[in-house]
Structures are given as structure tokens and as C-alpha cells.
Amino acid sequence: MAGERRPLMAANWKMNKTVREAQDYMAALLPRVADLAGEVDVAVFAPFTCLSEVARMAEGSGVLAGAQNFFYEDSGAYTGEVSAPMLLDVGARASIVGHSERRELFCETDESVARKARRAVEAGLLPVVCVGETEEERDAGRMWEKVSGQVRAVVEGLGDASGGRVVFAYEPIWAIGTGKTASPEDAQDAIGRIRGLLRELRGEGFAEEARLLYGGSIKPENISEIMAQKDVDGGLVGGASLEVGSFLQLVEAARG
């Protein structure tokens, strides 16, 4: 990881945790990360039902409270959706955009993901944009075709936003929740290519400012090798983030 980019370790709780469970988690997490300011950024992406409580508890701590999704319009007849202004209103400062589960289960497209990323930046939310390929696409030699198309769609819609205002998370879909993990070398290959594409599309400054995460069955046993890769700036963590103890191990590993 480049020294000038601060690592980011992000917990994605997915559809887990009640308000009480979220309170207990944050009460255990916050004292342990209080001394990490300036060394590691920590984010917690919570379900909508407990997001306001996570944001309330995180206020002033340096921990980013984030949502797992939102819609790109600010208001209107969009039953079941929430908007960027609504997230800001409850204290969220970031949002995951385009997670593979959203793309697969809820039919999100490169176009809709790009619109969400642009709206997040406009509203002042930090988008964590997920990109990645299926096992079939990888086996067919189409990994880079898929990932580069996803990245291009987002970057071309960002206007003049700086690289520091967007995060990309490479999550090989075949490694999410399966116990399979891309090798550290595979993670670096994909993420290094993404940084190269950002450089091609937006220049050196944008590419060097943007933080690029790895996501896909991250756990304490493999995080150190992954974080040792020069272009990997942190992790988007699913299952291993549900227990505060294991997530703290990942945060400590990112600290170096």
C-alpha cells in the first residue's frame, strides 16, 4: 500500500443486527479504535434500521457510519427506497454502491450504479463502489473486460470529482461468502489494473488519491498478506466483520 493513502477497513453487516446488537457492537468497537486517528480509517455499513443509532454513537469518534445502498433520486414515488439527503439526515457519511448482491439480486446495472456514485459525491457522501467478476467470467478470460467496464461507467459519470472522494472495492464474486479468497497476487493484479485504468481515465493525481479495497472472504488469517500488496488500501469485510473481535484484528492488521 502506498504510504500517502490512509488505509480503510470497512465492515459491511449486510442484513444483520438489531438496534440493540448494533449498540453492543459499537460500544465494544469505539474504545478500541479511539487511538487510531490518522493511522486507519474505520467504517461501519449498517442496515437502515440501525443506521441512525450507529451514526449517533460514532459521532466525533472518527468512525464513518455508512449505508449499504440508496437511490439516486432525492425524493418521489420510489416505494421502499431512501435517498442521499435522507442518509445524511440520520448521520451517514458514506454508502456502499453496486455491491454484487445488489447487482445480482436486485438487477442493478452499471448505469444505475454510476448514477448512485455520482449522486453520492454530489451530496457529500463517500461512495464505496463495488466491482468484480463471476467465476464463469474469470474462467472465460473475461475478468478485466467485466471489471474495467464497471469502473469506466462510474468514473466517466463522476464529473470533476477528485480521487479522494471515491473508493473502489474489488470483490471477486466467486469469493464472497464462499470461503474462497483471491490470492494476494490475484488481488494485486486486479487492483493494480484498476489503478492503472483510473490513471488512464483521469490522470495520475486521481489514481493516486483513490483508495482501492479488496473484498471477498477476508479474515484475520489472510489480511496481512493482502494488505502487503502495494495497491491494496484496505478491505470491505462481510462475515468477518459481524463479530467485533475479528473485525478489530483486521483493523489492527491494516494499521501495520
UniProtKB/Swiss-Prot annotation:
Key words of the record: Cytoplasm, Gluconeogenesis, Glycolysis, Isomerase
GO biological process terms held by the UniProt record: gluconeogenesis; glyceraldehyde-3-phosphate biosynthetic process; glycerol catabolic process; glycolytic process
Keyword Hydrolase: no
Catalysis: reaction(s): D-glyceraldehyde 3-phosphate = dihydroxyacetone phosphate
Enzymatic class: isomerase
Molecular function GO terms recorded: triose-phosphate isomerase activity
Record pathway: Carbohydrate biosynthesis; gluconeogenesis; Carbohydrate degradation; glycolysis; D-glyceraldehyde 3-phosphate from glycerone phosphate: step 1/1
Amino-acid positions noted as binding substrate in the UniProt annotation, renumbered to this chain: N12, W13, K14, G177, S217, G238, G239
Keyword Secreted: no
Classification via InterPro entries: Aldolase_TIM, TIM_sf, TrioseP_Isoase_bac/euk, Triosephosphate_isomerase, Triosephosphate_isomerase_AS
Oligomeric and partner information: Homodimer.
PANTHER family, per the entry: TRIOSEPHOSPHATE ISOMERASE
UniProt protein name: Triosephosphate isomerase
Organism: Rubrobacter xylanophilus (strain DSM 9941 / JCM 11954 / NBRC 16129 / PRD-1)
Highest classification ranks of the organism: Bacteria, Bacillati, Actinomycetota, Rubrobacteria, Rubrobacterales
